[in-house]
């Protein structure tokens, strides 16, 4: 763990003033900021500098000078964003306040990626100070998640645009200088390239406005490419317009928009609409006169079907190009000068070191199944094989295998929504109406009204207030926003009705009847279904705003509520694309690992019924969920806000809590955890590593999922399935089963990374189960990984392993789900601590938590795991079911998403090769059966040659020999042997016992 260097005593006393002097000098001399702004920034700096000087700081840099620079940037960014939001843009006239985030970073010699990586630590520490200075809604006004998402999207889109431009156009007008796919990225890109990007940025500012989702922005970029193809002089073209294999013909001419729609997987209707917006933008901003392309004669339009196209004379002529670029540059500068946001021109600047080369999520940015750092503008050679390279078109449009990218994957998923869901009727089908009308009373009208209100809350329209606030924007901006919101509401509504009908059919078969009154009259169930549908629509379009958990806040449900429907939703929508299934499963993982355990979760309401012994602790900590806001309350907020974003979270927290004791349910853990996976949860899809948890859903659970009607029934109601359980007990049993499955995956990953024995794996797993069952309160307000990490260290101590907490944390950092906040900020209630020297709630590092909270509670359970641990110490204060708690189950077999058999005719599997499988699979007698990517199968060979050999064997017409060959290097492996070898064998959960020690912080 890299932590801040300790400050010297002189720095802590007499050096404090010099710290403020350096900050003031940085503001005034380094950035030429105005006096009023410097005064406000100095106020925040002085209020927070004790945190900078604290020995407990955890910003991941080494030198004190580096720490200061980060802190300077964080303070200035926060003040810039929050003071402007508070003042309502009243400081626009003060030139000393007109600066962007990029200017601050350049002054501090930092890059964007490192800024986003360390910002959560600043927010965690300075959050209370920001709340005191700027109000409780400071985090939403700061918009860090949105800014980070925007950066990720633009990183992808800029690579997408650069690749497409280099395929379509030359760097110069000389045809001999055509760039190849392997040419150097240092090639100078002409003004046409910059013009296109600036036009795209102008489109984002003036037309897309609030809803800058990835799909809409991709349509915008493709529209810009169309403008360039029409107007860039023919001598710069790198394509032949007569190439029938690349372009769609309409008669004897090329249909340009249809061609681009096919190549880049866009909707041709959306492309036409966006083209109209671009044309209007050029007319208004560049003062160019539009002409019907069909009435204009120019070499650029030869062999193009000009129907519906617009042409601007002199738009790309060299005499006018510089002026147009300058106009767009000024327009963009004016638009961002006082917003403190990113200067999005950095993505096409020649000097792009400001972008950085780090990563943004748990050590790596997870994009479409690969971990990839943000590169500077990658060379064509790199992007050809990169999974981040844009859709390879037009040259590869007809290729059998085109590598998927985040952008192309998003467009493919959007096509599913457009072709499968959009054509459906925006009302209940006849079959669904039959179920709705078969209840004790007809609930059709209720279902329709609820859907309208909830989806309006999730996808609000722009109100008159926003129309006025959009000064300087085109008049069509608000109209575009409203059209976007209406389209998304319609898609979510149709998906909701479709899945609801399928679920009703399945439930009726379970219950042997059409009367589903208990389910179809359950308000919470319907809101969960609507939230799930809306989240899929948002995930498909990859929005910058309304990131998860926005759907929870706007529908009034909790994480525990949503976790009940995700599995059923996936199961009952068979057409759901694989990437959306992954998205829902990644959400479920996020819900289970921490969000369900946070204050205000409805899980605690069920847990208090299922485990009465925990009720007092749950009430003491104020963990119970508040009543769900009524539909009328949500509708009122929609109407009062005139379509602006309704402040439902405050309604949920305050209006329905007259005693005022619950207050803000957000914990520092939640604040920071939301930044760790902006890319994973929304801006890209989860990796196959996460699919290990999805695969666990196939493991037979001890507690089968209950029927939906019982999952959403009152916690105290008897389970209609029998067994003498209440619905709360059934729900908690199912929930605990999911937690144990998720823990099994993560424990196994750490075991493999630490190269520990299967016996240790079994012991850690047994301990985790015991803690969940008998020390459930240790999970309250915490992340399950915190319990897992402490369990590893506790088991290491009783097993006399030479394993330090530092080694555990270092290896945890390499896990795909790692969040630094897990070990940097653990909730503690000092009233329950071993050394009760402080009072109240606090957040400490994981070693302090282990010593003060974990070991005093778990030590008896650790002793029980040892052969001789059944005499000295017994557990006499179980949280759960008492001494009669069921014996922990052995470690389950964890199927990988692989092995994947390539085809029925080839005896070839593809599977991740873990260290635990290596010895079993790669023996001397069977080595030729396996090809390890990155490790040659023969001497002096390369991985690329290995892959060529594999492909040739799979694709070639190999003649089978008539005689059997018993040579070592020949033969086949049976399917059963391969399948069985890929499952880890169960071990023994017993291990020798040693004295349970506490961990000392390591220097």
Swiss-Prot record:
UniProt similarity note: Belongs to the retinoblastoma protein (RB) family.
Residue span of region Spacer: 608-729
Pfam families from the UniProt entry: DUF3452, RB_A, RB_B
Keyword tags: Cell cycle, Nucleus, Repressor, Transcription, Transcription regulation
SUPFAM superfamilies xrefs: Cyclin-like
Name listed for the protein in its UniProt record: Retinoblastoma-related protein 1
Described purpose of this protein according to its UniProt entry: Regulator of biological processes that recruits a histone deacetylase to control gene transcription. Formation of stable complexes with geminiviridae replication-associated proteins may create a cellular environment which favors viral DNA replication. May play a role in the entry into mitosis, negatively regulating the cell proliferation during leaf, stem, and flower development. Critical regulator of the endocycle.
Spans annotated as Domain A: 405-607
Positions of the UniProt region annotated as Pocket: 405-860
Location relative to the cell: Nucleus
Species this chain originates from: Nicotiana benthamiana
Region annotated Domain B, chain positions: 730-860
Superkingdom, natural source: Eukaryota
GO cellular component, one term: transcription regulator complex
Region Disordered, residue ranges: 868-899
